[in-house]
Amino acid sequence: MVLDNIRNFSIIAHIDHGKSTLADRLLEYTGALTEREMQNQVLDKMDLERERGITIKAQAVRLNYQANDGRQYILNLIDTPGHVDFTYEVSRSLSACEGALLVVDASQGVEAQTLANVYLALENDLDVFPVLNKIDLPAAEPERVKQEIEDIIGLDAHDAVLASAKEGIGTREILEEIVNKIPPPRGDAAKPLKALLFDSWYDQYQGVIVLVRILDGSVKKGDKIQLMSNRRNYEVLKVGVFSPAMCEVASLSAGEVGFIIGGIKDVQDAKVGDTITNLHNPCDAPLSGFKEVQPMVFSGLYPIDTSQYEQLRDALAKLKLNDSSFSYEPETSLALGFGFRCGFLGLLHMEIIQERLEREFNLDLITTAPTVVYKVHRLDGSIITIESANQLPPTQEIEFVEEPFILASIHVPNEFVGGILALCEEKRGVQREIKYLTPTRVMIVYELPLNEVVLDFYDRLKSITKGYASLDYEHLDYRRSNLERLNIMINGEVVDALSLIIHKEKAYYRGRDLVSKMKELIPRQMFEIAIQAAIGNKVIARETVKALRKDVLAKCYGGDITRKRKLLEKQKEGKKRMKNVGNVELPQEAFLAILKVEG
């Protein structure tokens, strides 16, 4: 294949700006799919991707296109995940391309997520050109949005393609732009094999399928390959391309994008960003930029019905096959029984995994409040990392605790600025800058503790701005903070599942809210129940659930007071004994409500 006739490109867009629909039109136009095979969002294979309108895994599709200059081109569309949690995957997918289409909704303009991914594309030296989508909408303002693209991103947008993926307007113009504006790949097929692995997933019949962009050299069936990060060796069983169905080809050479199947059993071995080379004729150095993705948010998942524990374990193992950035380990809780502590890249990642467990595997789950990774500096000089309140050592052993901070950039219409600033201040944020991108849109940049963001920040951000805010964040560093463990006690017993790590200033208010919420939810028993919030040995808030009382004097009718007193004393004794041995059953709602108490 002549390198000059290949174009590798991806599509950058904010959620819901029409990326997957545009990809469908390109597939349809180039004849990759017949009318009969067309379905909406062909590349989003998971139901969940279609429903939420987001792309979770990367896909790569080869399109054959006869251009206006009469030449036949191969266009490789590499579809990238578009959400903030998957930034590393996006950057790897982008580095497999030479150019990108920036798709912007002509009625909404530039959003935070678009901005983050455009900067990633420019860092990877991609040629980016804008496409205004949804121009068929009555609210479309192409001229205003062109100006926004020039002002905010600094891209020349005067000749941006006007398109409507839904109506099929502008599809040929976009394909011509791809051919004319995106440079062909560079590479040398005679050099030793060097390929970038930019996605992998597990297929139950063929093992792990890896998506690669060949930079130098070539690969064919029967070759011995090596993954350079872990020095694992495999024999190539199949090479091929997606168009969009899997098609086997004789070989893949420099500049091309396709898949390799090599009998790899575990997705853990095929990490995104790794370099693949030939075992007997290796390239001199791996590609730069590879890193192990670390989970940032942790949460406990427990089956509501304990008999589903085995099913949950199998389901997690299956999800792990396709998602190497997700981690889990068994944990037990006195209150919730057996479950798993799971690690996620971020909030959206967590929601997606939970939703897939419930939907694809029919599991009913309780999720404990999400936590982040803290660094605890002990007095003996050692540093430990913890991801749940129950792992925090006693106060007398701790010198100080550090928590992770993020840099959040929030794009909002200017009428909501006051509410957003108040929210960020309440979440212990440090203001970096406020920038008016246009007379009506503002970018607010804050440094925020991740611990404050994981609970309900995103929901409140959306409700303050009526859904118009968009948020993007990147991890900054760890900072020393005044953090403590808040325990909830019921009749003097600590309920481990409800413990949390919280900032000292907020501990009293949070404790008070929690105990009053629990008071409403715990059913009354025959004895009174004390609900307390405590830091260390100091109780900071208390509520009491009053006892139910049986009228033991009903049968007495008048008569001697000593008889009544005897019965009352007996009742009192019984209640006392009951309180000592009685167990308080915490209803499921109590746990769920605790997660919903405003942080």
Swiss-Prot record:
It is a peripheral membrane protein. Residues 4-186 form the tr-type G domain. GO terms for biological process: positive regulation of translation. One of its GO terms (cellular component) is plasma membrane. It holds the Pfam family EFG_C. Its main location: membrane. GTP binds at residues 16-21, 133-136. Gene3D superfamilies: 3.30.70.240, Elongation factor 4, C-terminal domain, Elongation Factor G (Translational Gtpase), domain 3, P-loop containing nucleotide triphosphate hydrolases, Translation factors. Its EC number is 3.6.5.n1. It is found in: Cell inner membrane. Required for accurate and efficient protein synthesis under certain stress conditions. May act as a fidelity factor of the translation reaction, by catalyzing a one-codon backward translocation of tRNAs on improperly translocated ribosomes. Back-translocation proceeds from a post-translocation (POST) complex to a pre-translocation (PRE) complex, thus giving elongation factor G a second chance to translocate the tRNAs correctly. Binds to ribosomes in a GTP-dependent manner. PANTHER family: TRANSLATION FACTOR GUF1 HOMOLOG, CHLOROPLASTIC (PTHR43512:SF4), TRANSLATION FACTOR GUF1-RELATED (PTHR43512). This is Elongation factor 4. It comes from Geotalea daltonii (strain DSM 22248 / JCM 15807 / FRC-32) (Geobacter daltonii). The gene is lepA.
